[in-house]
UniProtKB/Swiss-Prot annotation:
Zn(2+) binds at C404, C407, C422, C427. It comes from Brachyspira hyodysenteriae (strain ATCC 49526 / WA1). Belongs to the NAD-dependent DNA ligase family. LigA subfamily. It is an enzyme of class 6 (ligase). Residues 585-663 form the BRCT domain. It catalyses: NAD(+) + (deoxyribonucleotide)n-3'-hydroxyl + 5'-phospho-(deoxyribonucleotide)m = (deoxyribonucleotide)n+m + AMP + beta-nicotinamide D-nucleotide. DNA ligase that catalyzes the formation of phosphodiester linkages between 5'-phosphoryl and 3'-hydroxyl groups in double-stranded DNA using NAD as a coenzyme and as the energy source for the reaction. It is essential for DNA replication and repair of damaged DNA. Transmembrane segments: none annotated. This is DNA ligase. GO terms for molecular function: DNA binding; DNA ligase (NAD+) activity; metal ion binding. GO terms for cellular component: cytosol.
């Protein structure tokens, strides 16, 4: 691979990994299996190692976790929270062990092994024996303050006998038993069951109502003391013992073992994990001696003295009863395997997406086959292969429909002969899925209009395009059964409120293929108005950093389609007013500088301080790096100050920043 090819591949991998990071860490809605994500991440690491001049400071390999939700107060961690590098097999673990031996000049390394819980990382801070702050990991530097919700967790000590400041790290999760009970309750209330325990745990911690959070039955499992230097703790196991003595739940710790014993422990727990009361997706292997840890230090996103040794996905056999082909908003025909329900990794699996006809053909999947199902990373189920020796003599290859299974319309193959799409613009399924997308939270945010009512509206013919939503009257709504005065009022209010929206949301809501939230934001910033956007040329689009050739063509084609242009005009005529949220900049000492803000600044929230810095012409970064020009320091500045001083970064005091911000 030459340098130009490497550059293109790195850009593709970066965009893909950032997309999946957002789904996993922020939206709690992963689309791909852990092992598929790990393959992408490993490929990016290898390319950046081979072509170091192409590595950017904002590469996913330098980042920890995801973005912070705006609804929560931000909390800056006193000590950075890191992620872990992965090893995927015995060979990679032994490579790690050999590296530790060489770097520590030791013939045998002692490790502490702990369960790698499949939940949400938390930090708990105790001062004078009282729990004062609990926060999520966030991006590793700044997390979300979820103290009130954490105090609702039954096994979190609200007070401890230790009076020194103590920073405890651990994982919030839901046990398998509680997860099953939680989903049973949701089904009884006719609510959609949670896909997995991690999503339920993460969503529970991010509830604004602590009473709702309490209903999730979250538990906290401690695994680290971040400020261990303040205590007489010489190894990992002593830290775990100390936490246990203080009343924290500590599970699955195997202390002071060598590499051979690590492997024995790994295979033993991998075999037994399905019988555990909680989900784990691997083991965490840490060099036991803290002096050795300090000598080894950290990489940009992970410690050098520890790795996550991931388990192989759990596999189960079951029978494929049917293949149903569903139609999405872009007309994509997606085959879904209907299975004899099977327990895999503590979850009942009855449906598995087969993605496209090629997957069915390449694996020769047939109705009636016995298939092997995995849940990689204990999240998303997937069929890996057919058990051919159990196939019946009368089985026949699956014939993918040549017509749309919903409307009977013609189909066409696109996207490199992979995706089959219904090309009938009047297809009921396409219309329904499109309206669902249009009203969704990241789009026009019509929170009072649910999927059930959208199906009713589209089936009746009341709504055929998104613009029809803005024509709905109270009389229209009262024609439907179960429609009351209160619900009708809520719906109409939700529709009316959506008219005042941002340009980014509006562009996203249009449903242009290849345009997600990030691309919509890039387009809004570049064009600044819907009228400018409508006039976009292919050159304009390709000039935008972050938008590739395929995305540019898709956007251009959308804007040169009479029907979609009419939709935009109809929406604007209905009173929809997409406004670009422009950041006005003024010349200042911050203009053109990369700036990081740490600590609290009087008169500013973290978000308003960021906006003020941007108005002064700065690019605000989340973490200090060699590319940071200025660190703005408020009260209770965290670890960023020391790092900035070590790197020789210019320090600006809060008073000076306040004067600049206030003009």
């Amino acid at each position: 691979m030459n340098i130009e090819e490497a550059k293109q591949r790195i850009e593709q991998l970066t965009e893909t990994i950032n997309y999946h990071n957002k789904l996993y860490y922020t939206d709690d809605n992963p689309e791909i299996e852990d092992y598929e994500y790990d393959k992408l991440f490993r490929e990016l690491e290898n390319l950046e190692r081979e072509f170091p001049e192409l590595k950017k400071d904002d590469s996913p390999t330098n980042k920890v976790g995801g973005t912070i939700l705006e609804k929560f107060e931000k909390f800056e961690h006193p000590i950075a929270m890191y992620s872990l590098s992965n090893v995927m097999n015995e060979e990679e673990f032994l490579e790690f062990d050999n590296r530790m031996q060489k770097e520590l000049n030791q013939s045998k390394i002692k490790y502490t092994v702990e369960n790698k819980f499949d939940g949400l990382a938390l930090e708990l801070i105790y001062e004078k024996g009282k729990l004062t702050v609990a926060s999520t990991r966030g991006d590793g530097q700044v997390g979300e303050n979820v103290t009130n919700n954490v105090k609702m967790m039954s096994n979190v000590p609200k007070s401890i006998k230790e009076k020194k400041k103590l920073i405890v790290r651990g994982e919030a999760l839901i046990t398998k038993k509680d997860f099953e009970a939680l989903n049973k309750e949701r089904e009884e209330l006719e609510e959609i069951p949670f896909a997995n325990a991690r999503n339920a745990a993460s969503g529970g911690l991010r509830q604004l109502d602590s009473a709702e959070s309490k209903k999730r039955r979250l538990k906290f499992f401690a695994y680290q003391i971040a400020n261990y230097k303040d205590f007489d703790l010489t190894n990992e196991y002593k830290s775990m013992e100390f936490l246990s003595e203080l009343g924290f739940t500590v599970e699955g710790v195997h202390p002071n073992i060598d590499a051979k014993k690590v492997l024995e422990t790994y295979y033993d727990i991998q075999e037994k994990r399905s019988k555990m009361d909680y989900e784990i997706d691997g083991l965490v292997i840490k060099v036991d001696d803290v002096k050795h840890q300090e000598k080894l230090g950290f990489l940009s996103r992970a410690p050098r003295f520890a790795v996550a040794f991931k388990f192989k996905p759990e596999e189960k056999e079951t029978v494929l009863k049917n293949i149903e082909v569903q139609v999405g908003r872009t007309g994509a025909l997606t085959p879904v395997a209907k299975l004899e329900p099977v327990q895999v990794g503590g979850v009942t699996v009855s449906n598995v997406t087969l993605h496209n006809p090629n997957e069915i053909k390449s694996k020769d999947i047939r109705i009636g086959d016995t298939v092997v199902v995995i849940r990689s990373g204990d999240v998303i189920p997937k069929i890996t292969r057919v058990v051919l020796e159990k196939r019946t003599a009368d089985s026949k290859p699956f014939e993918f429909p040549k017509k749309c299974p919903v409307c009977g319309g013609d189909t066409a193959v696109t996207d490199g002969d992979v995706i089959v799409r219904c090309i009938n613009e009047e297809c009921p399924s396409k219309i329904t899925r499109y309206i669902e997308y249009f009203v969704s939270k990241p789009a026009m945010n019509m929170e009072r209009i649910g999927k059930e009512w959208i199906a009713v509206f589209t089936k009746s013919g009341l709504v055929k395009t998104p613009a029809d939503l803005y024509k709905i009257t109270r009389d229209d709504l009262f024609k439907f059964e179960r429609m009351g005065e209160k619900l009708a009022g809520y719906m109409l209010e939700s529709i009316e409120n959506s008219k005042n929206t941002t340009l980014k949301r509006f562009i996203y809501a249009l449903g242009i293929r290849q345009v997600g939230e990030t691309t919509a934001d890039l387009l809004a910033k570049y064009f600044t108005s819907i009228e400018n956007f409508k006039k976009a040329t292919i050159d304009d689009l390709q000039n935008i950093e972050g938008i590739g050739e395929i995305s540019a063509k898709s956007i251009y084609d959308f804007l040169h389609n009479e029907k979609t242009l009419k939709l935009i005009d109809d929406l604007l005529a209905s009173g929809v007013n997409p406004v670009f949220e422009k950041v006005v900049t003024v010349e200042s000492p911050l203009t053109g500088k990369n700036v990081v803000i740490t600590g609290s600044i009087e008169g500013f929230t973290r978000n308003s301080a960021k906006e003020a810095a941007e108005r002064l012409g700065a690019t605000v970064q989340s973490a200090v790096s060699k590319n940071t020009n200025i660190l703005i320091v408020g009260e209770k500045a965290g670890s960023k100050l020391k790092k900035a001083q070590d790197l020789g970064v210019e320090i600006m005091e809060a008073d000076e920043f306040i004067k600049l911000a206030n003009g």
